[in-house]
Swiss-Prot record:
Described function: Involved in catabolism of D-apiose. Catalyzes the transfer of the glycolaldehyde group from apulose-4-phosphate to D-glyceraldehyde 3-phosphate, generating dihydroxyacetone phosphate and D-xylulose-5-phosphate.
Reaction(s) the record says it catalyses: apulose 4-phosphate + D-glyceraldehyde 3-phosphate = D-xylulose 5-phosphate + dihydroxyacetone phosphate
Cofactor: thiamine diphosphate
GO molecular function, a single term: transferase activity
One protein family per Pfam: Transketolase_N
Listed EC numbers: 2.2.1.13
Protein name: Apulose-4-phosphate transketolase subunit A
PANTHER family with a match to the protein in the record: TRANSKETOLASE N-TERMINAL SECTION-RELATED (PTHR47514:SF1)
Listed pathway(s): Carbohydrate metabolism
Keyword terms, alphabetized: Carbohydrate metabolism, Thiamine pyrophosphate, Transferase
Entry similarity comment: Belongs to the transketolase family.
Entry keyword annotation includes Cytoplasm: no
Subunit structure: Probable heterodimer composed of AptA and AptB.
Length: 276
């Protein structure tokens, strides 16, 4: 079970605290960051780490722990902020993000950061590995679940769809794929670069059980994830999000894919994220 199991209100407060960490972390990075991608995933990560995952930071080698894979590796900054808030890594590591010899590199690296299960960043790799882990869990009789978060533009990588076919073939109902559908990627709007809509129909055609939620609404995310039951099919949650969610001048702005807040922007963002 989850060691925190927070209420909806408590999860909302955690999400806001993680967003504040994201602002400061990116502002202090010597090598830029991915502020928009970090922010769009916050409610998803918060729901998983503080309510849904059977994963304890004090027992990282438990063979029955649920596995979470951050396939959208460019969202590493937000991922680290969540790991710090949840007690997987020390808070004082966050100011070292992307510094030389840091344990928090620009994309997740398993042997450097406690809690990270897979090196990611080259898009389209996380889901295939998650499928392999789900197959292994089935074969060994494990009850663990495998969760993987994919980006929106990431679904343009064909390896995801090969993995989906395999997941359906092996009836991996212990696999939960979450799409952070924020409608943007590095070069602009996903629909203008390589449109994957209607995404629900595509996943269904590949043999998935499809769920949908408002990905920046804690209650919607939690209720959707907790409603998933084994039924012989892999599960996909299309989480409709806003890139840069939570900060008005970042939301839905393509330039914030690789931009970080500076100067007055930091103060403005933190002002918007104050506890009420």
């Amino acid at each position: 079970m989850n060691p925190y199991n927070l209420s909806y209100d408590e999860l909302e407060k955690k999400a806001k605290a993680i967003r504040r960490k994201i602002v400061v972390l990116n502002a202090n990075s010597p090598a830029g960051g991915h502020t928009g991608a970090d922010l769009s995933q916050v409610e998803i990560l918060t729901s998983l780490y503080f309510r849904v995952l059977n994963n304890d930071p004090k027992d990282l080698i438990n063979p029955e722990r649920d596995i979470y894979i951050q396939s959208k590796g460019h969202g590493a900054g937000g991922y680290y902020c969540c790991l710090a808030e949840a007690g997987y890594i020390p808070e004082d590591w966050l100011p070292t993000y992307q510094h030389s010899d840091s344990k928090l590199p620009g994309h997740p690296v398993k042997h450097k950061t406690p809690g990270v299960e897979l090196n990611t960043g080259a898009l389209g790799h996380g889901l295939p590995v998650a499928v392999g882990l789900a197959i292994a869990a089935k074969k060994s009789g494990s009850k663990r679940k495998i969760y993987v978060l994919t980006g929106d533009g990431e679904l343009g990588e064909g390896s995801n769809w090969e993995a989906a076919l395999t997941a359906a073939q092996y009836k991996l109902d212990n696999l939960i794929i979450i799409n952070d559908k924020n409608k943007l990627q590095l070069a602009g709007f996903t629909k203008d670069i390589l449109c994957t809509d209607p995404l629900d129909k595509k996943w269904e055609a590949f043999g998935m059980e499809v769920h949908e939620c408002q990905g920046n609404d804690i209650r919607s995310v939690v209720d959707t994830l907790e409603s998933i039951q084994p039924n012989g099919k892999p599960h996909v949650v299309i989480a409709n999000t806003t890139k840069g969610a939570g900060i008005s001048f970042i939301e839905g702005r393509p330039e914030w894919h690789h931009k970080v807040p500076k100067g007055d922007e930091v103060e403005l963002a933190l002002e918007e994220l104050k506890d009420e």
